[in-house]
Amino acid sequence: MPRSVPVMTDVIQVTKRESTGTAATRRLRRDGHVPAVLYGHGEANEHLAVPSAQVKGLLRHHSKTVQLSGDVDETALVSDMQWDPLGIEVLHMDLIRVNLKEKVELGVPIVLHGEAVGVREGGMLLENVHEVEIRCSAGSIPDNLVLEVSELGVGEHKTAGDLTLPEGVELITDVDVVIAHIEAQRDEEIAEAGDALAEPEVISKGSGEADE
């Protein structure tokens, strides 16, 4: 079974922003940068610009913690990303100052692993919850948490307490929260599926009259 592994800390180059108005922010985005704000630890907020290409790298790597370089030398936690209405481009980032040893609380995604017995028996695997809240050191945040479902039968479920937790990771979400379950298909759903397989596809249909 795959193991949950900590995410490597990405290094991103940042520059300080002198102007923070709407017009300045639009120019920043046109120039290929994402505006960001760094805060926390009782220090003053820093308004930053991050290259869009590096933000895309964070998304590919599922990075939670980043090492800031350039105008600011800090370790930060990516606490929030604001997206455009289509969910394509990141419009803004919130970063929280952390040190890699301090404890942080955040949500991490769940990955279901294995082909459930109940699915092979004709049931449906339904995922009730897609992420859970955990507490761990900022330098040991896992990419995801794995839930083994291969032995799950029809009518059975797995809870947050069944998740595989890496060393040093504490579950905040209630252990009794149902993450996934196997539901039996209703008779009418099975009948409809059978009818769909039995009926040939009509490629074209004539009017019933012979061509003249």
From Swiss-Prot:
UniProt organism field: Rhodopirellula baltica (strain DSM 10527 / NCIMB 13988 / SH1)
Function: This is one of the proteins that binds to the 5S RNA in the ribosome where it forms part of the central protuberance.
Family: Belongs to the bacterial ribosomal protein bL25 family. CTC subfamily.
GO cellular component: cytosolic large ribosomal subunit
Gene Ontology biological-process entries: translation
Name of this chain's protein: Large ribosomal subunit protein bL25
GO molecular-function term, one example from the UniProt record: structural constituent of ribosome
SUPFAM superfamilies found in the cross-reference section: Ribosomal protein L25-like
Keywords noted in UniProt: Ribonucleoprotein, Ribosomal protein, RNA-binding, rRNA-binding
Record region (Disordered): 190-212
The organism's taxonomic lineage, starting at the top: Bacteria, Pseudomonadati, Planctomycetota, Planctomycetia, Pirellulales
CDD domains: Ribosomal_L25_TL5_CTC
HAMAP family (alphabetical): Ribosomal_bL25_CTC
Entry annotated with the keyword Ribosomal protein: yes
Quaternary organization: Part of the 50S ribosomal subunit; part of the 5S rRNA/L5/L18/L25 subcomplex. Contacts the 5S rRNA. Binds to the 5S rRNA independently of L5 and L18.
Gene: rplY
Pfam families found in the cross-reference section: Ribosomal_L25p, Ribosomal_TL5_C
